[in-house]
């Protein structure tokens, strides 16, 4: 009788637990697409849209994230932090994973993310088919259904996903303009990545790109990574800019968080131009917003500073002669002119856009 009572209690507890709602990720949605390039494989797309997307007419950069079955929540969190702090723009995240019945990510990523076949993984070698899926099926799917900027795509992945990222950089140069590779599996097939880079280098037809890659400091492959980094640095590409880092006291999987944080900062990095006083002084003075907010702009030591009150200020950096920004929050300013004279600016802050007119 006691055993029956215990079973009854456990059953009730399980049923009660099963009634709780699942945690979801606000601002995200799931779409599915079946590929003809990868033999009828169904892919699940985990898509994150920026706040304000529904009422905006602008197009957004798109980050394509590999292995989103593991990393979509992480990247969603990173995006929110980096956007709020003003290091990256509003963007769309498209996480790609596998759909269908009981997909095995370990086997499928070995198939889709590797450029050649290794005997230990007979399913490997499908990277070109997967990239064909992305180029001819996934991009059109996203860009016809979402406000996606086709000229601003970023590829991001770890391990084999990082291998795919570097392989794409060297062999499918027109697909992306930003690449973030966490602990890439550069040793694949006797370091065949060097052969792809050789062909890439000899073509001398490189499109502009920014690349960020890392490795964990406790990984055994650190010497090989450092060799690759030096090799690429010695190439001295004119349009491909590469930044790398060995992450202290970090293992293989642990590279993702810092890599995706710093990688997104790097690929979206804006210039900090030095403007002459003659330019900055055009912008100094008093301004008033449509809601009555009053601010002052001052030139302090060849740096434009905006004051909302004496104790509330932002240092501004010049991305161009008329565009300025701050990095302690999402804060972008674009100055406007009337008959050659500065008459105001548009201020784009986190979830808020406002116009200001110059009053003196």
Question: What does each of the following model-derived ranges do?
Answer:
Residues 18-61:
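A domain-start/cap signature at the N-terminus of enzymes
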Residues 49, 269-360:
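Peripheral terminal and inter-domain segments
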Residues 54, 108-159:
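Gly/Ser-rich "nucleophile elbow"/oxyanion-hole loop immediately N-terminal to the catalytic nucleophile
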Residues 69-132:
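Active-site machinery of serine-nucleophile hydrolases
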């Amino acid at each position: 009788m006691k055993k029956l009572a215990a079973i009854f209690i456990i059953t009730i507890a399980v049923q009660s637990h099963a009634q709780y709602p699942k945690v979801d990720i606000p601002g995200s949605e799931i779409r599915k697409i079946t590929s003809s390039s990868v033999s009828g494989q169904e892919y699940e797309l985990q898509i994150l849209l920026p706040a304000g997307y529904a009422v905006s007419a602008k197009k957004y950069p798109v980050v394509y994230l590999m292995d989103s079955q593991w990393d979509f929540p992480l990247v969603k969190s990173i995006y929110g932090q980096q956007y709020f702090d003003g290091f990256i723009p509003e963007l769309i995240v498209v996480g790609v994973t596998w759909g269908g019945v009981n997909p095995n990510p370990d086997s499928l990523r070995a198939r889709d993310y590797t450029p050649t076949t290794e005997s230990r993984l007979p399913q490997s070698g499908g990277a070109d088919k997967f990239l064909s899926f992305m180029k001819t099926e996934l991009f059109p799917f996203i860009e016809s259904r979402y406000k996606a900027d086709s000229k601003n795509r970023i590829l991001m992945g770890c391990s084999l996903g990082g291998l795919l990222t570097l392989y794409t950089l060297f062999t499918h140069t027109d697909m992306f303009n930003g690449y973030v590779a966490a602990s890439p599996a550069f040793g694949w097939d006797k370091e065949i990545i060097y052969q792809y880079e050789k062909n890439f280098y000899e073509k001398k037809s490189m499109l502009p790109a920014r690349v960020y890659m890392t490795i964990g400091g406790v990984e055994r492959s650190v010497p090989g990574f450092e060799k690759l980094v030096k090799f690429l640095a010695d190439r001295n590409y004119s349009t491909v800019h590469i930044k790398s880092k060995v992450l202290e006291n970090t293992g293989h999987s642990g590279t993702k968080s810092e890599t995706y944080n710093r990688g997104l900062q790097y690929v979206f990095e804006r210039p900090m131009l030095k403007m002459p006083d003659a330019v900055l002084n055009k912008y100094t003075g008093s301004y008033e917003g449509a809601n009555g907010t009053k601010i002052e702009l001052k030139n302090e030591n060849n740096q434009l500073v905006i004051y909302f009150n004496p104790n509330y200020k932002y240092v501004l950096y010049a991305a161009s002669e008329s565009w300025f920004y701050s990095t302690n929050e999402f804060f972008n300013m674009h100055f406007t002119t009337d008959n050659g004279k500065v008459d105001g600016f548009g201020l784009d802050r986190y979830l808020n856009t406002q116009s200001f007119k110059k009053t003196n």
